[in-house]
């Protein structure tokens, strides 16, 4: 009797698929409730999580069952002509370009943060050492490739004699690149024959997205990085699901090189994506191996001799181990178990008293940027640091787990408030409005997250993308599930790097790629299909 009820409840889903729904539901429940351990205690949180898991699993099973039934219906391919694709591309580009330009002219010369100021200072040759920057001159702390792009524009516009104009022109070019990439992505799905409703919905998401509008004219490497990630995701989709192999080697190489050099974790994102693609698609292994080898060689050349020849200082090792550094600092702050040998090593990195007083659960920056923090010692003793961190783990497991939760929960706890935008321009000056209607989408985004923190937080965005991919994959056949995984691998790898070295909790710019990818995850996961239903 019970078995029949369970079978009826599961519908078209197999046992493994039902189990997967429960696993996903349990992970979601703990993501919601784990940060509340300090308020309610383990038993109450466990009870709440059981209830939430059952409800979530039931909803997932019902949704997945419906999607699986829909996916059984055959569809007739209906690709559109090249003329229709060009028209769609031009219309999308024109609308996005005008929208972004309105934001730029209303907030001239565009938005800048502390990181942007550091980049401009390097370009102008006035970068000085500080506890925040910790470099004097050119440095790869902010990817030197992005700094180089800014430098090129500054050199080309130097005869104007205006720093603001140079910034404005650079951000105009950045927003144009963003508009081109987004319009190309829309045009791909137009070409593949997706319905007008989906195309219009995806376009509307881009056009009326306040975070995208703000970021397009903000001097952050995350904007171009996220656009490149989206380009790679959509190109992988057109390759793996629709067999579009034309120029795949070149486009894959360009996208991977840009991702590698636009952000410090880009190499890991590219490596993980190429590895999974190599394993899952035997027919593409030669091209993938060639691209991987080229990217690896370029990375070694740039990070080694090229940076040395240019006199560019490498990024500090501490930037790559933010979470382990936080866990050690939390142990010191809370009086955890530390033996004499461990204490001696920690004191060489930063005196324990200073570490105890500087610890901030939400970011390792007060530790890394302390005036007594010895970056040089840490650079020379990387292995010893990792050994010390690992040796402290067994005796301080609870503290380590809590420190990890506090530092990363912005990327997995739905509703955790995120830092979204910056509203100032260079050196914290107020931007100028040349249009007269004071349009700053960043303020709108901030008001939205203040009023509705759940749908506008980093954690919620990530879970939304994960849920769409999950429910879509349940309805796909085995081969297509693997291909879906390849397509979203840049997002998975990006998130994984934040779980190891998040610079701050819940910083939306770090996961901006998820925002851009959200409407395109629907067809990738098979939730929206090309063509029309077969009569």
Segments predicted by a language model, with ranges:
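Membrane-interface anchor segments at the N-terminal boundary of transmembrane helices
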Residues: 165-169, 404-488
């Amino acid at each position: 009797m019970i078995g029949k009820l369970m079978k009826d409840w599961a519908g078209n889903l197999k046992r493994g698929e039902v189990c997967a729904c429960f696993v996903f539901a349990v992970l979601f429940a703990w993501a919601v409730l784990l940060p509340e351990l300090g308020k309610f205690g383990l038993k109450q949180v466990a009870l709440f999580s059981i209830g939430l898991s059952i409800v979530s699993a039931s909803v997932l099973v019902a949704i997945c069952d419906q999607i699986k039934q829909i996916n059984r219906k055959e569809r007739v391919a209906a690709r559109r002509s090249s003329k229709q694709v060009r028209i769609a591309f031009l219309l999308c580009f024109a609308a996005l370009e005008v929208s972004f330009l309105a934001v730029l002219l209303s907030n001239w010369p565009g938005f800048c943060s502390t990181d942007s100021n550091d980049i401009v200072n390097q370009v102008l040759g006035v970068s000085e050492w500080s506890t925040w920057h910790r470099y004097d001159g050119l440095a790869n702390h902010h990817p030197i490739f992005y700094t180089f792009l800014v430098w090129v524009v500054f050199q080309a516009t130097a005869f104007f004699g205006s720093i603001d104009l140079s910034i404005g022109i650079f951000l105009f070019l950045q927003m144009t690149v963003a508009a081109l990439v987004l319009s190309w992505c829309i045009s791909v799905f137009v070409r593949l024959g997706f319905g007008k409703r989906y195309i219009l919905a995806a376009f509307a998401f881009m056009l009326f997205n306040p975070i995208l509008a703000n970021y397009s004219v903000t001097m952050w490497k995350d904007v171009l990085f996220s656009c490149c990630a989206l380009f790679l995701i959509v190109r992988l989709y057109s390759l793996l699901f629709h067999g579009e192999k034309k120029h795949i080697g070149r486009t894959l190489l360009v996208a991977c090189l840009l991702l590698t050099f636009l952000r410090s974790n880009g190499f890991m994102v590219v490596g993980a994506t190429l590895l999974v693609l190599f394993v899952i698609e035997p027919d593409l292994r030669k091209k993938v191996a060639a691209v991987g080898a080229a990217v690896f060689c370029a990375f070694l050349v740039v990070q080694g001799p090229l940076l040395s020849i240019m006199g560019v200082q490498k990024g500090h090792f501490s930037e790559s181990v933010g979470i382990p550094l936080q866990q050690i600092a939390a142990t010191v702050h809370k009086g955890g178990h530390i033996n004499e040998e461990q204490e001696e090593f920690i004191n060489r990195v930063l005196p324990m008293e200073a570490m105890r007083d500087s610890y901030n659960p939400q970011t390792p920056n007060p530790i890394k940027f302390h005036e007594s923090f010895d970056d040089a010692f840490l650079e020379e003793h990387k292995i010893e640091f990792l050994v010390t961190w690992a040796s402290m783990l067994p005796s301080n497991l609870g503290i380590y787990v809590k420190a990890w939760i506090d530092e990363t929960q912005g990327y997995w706890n739905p509703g955790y408030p995120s830092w979204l935008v910056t509203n100032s321009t260079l050196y914290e000056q107020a931007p100028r409005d040349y249009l007269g209607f004071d349009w700053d989408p960043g303020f709108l985004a901030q008001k939205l997250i203040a009023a509705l923190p759940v749908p506008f937080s980093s954690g919620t965005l990530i879970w939304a993308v994960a849920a769409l991919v999950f429910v879509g994959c349940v309805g796909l056949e085995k081969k297509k599930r693997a291909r879906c995984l390849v397509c979203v691998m840049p997002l998975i790898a990006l998130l994984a790097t934040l779980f190891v070295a998040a610079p701050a909790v819940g910083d939306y710019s770090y996961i901006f790629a998820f925002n851009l990818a959200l409407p395109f995850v629907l067809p990738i996961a098979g939730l929206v299909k090309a063509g029309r239903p077969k009569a």
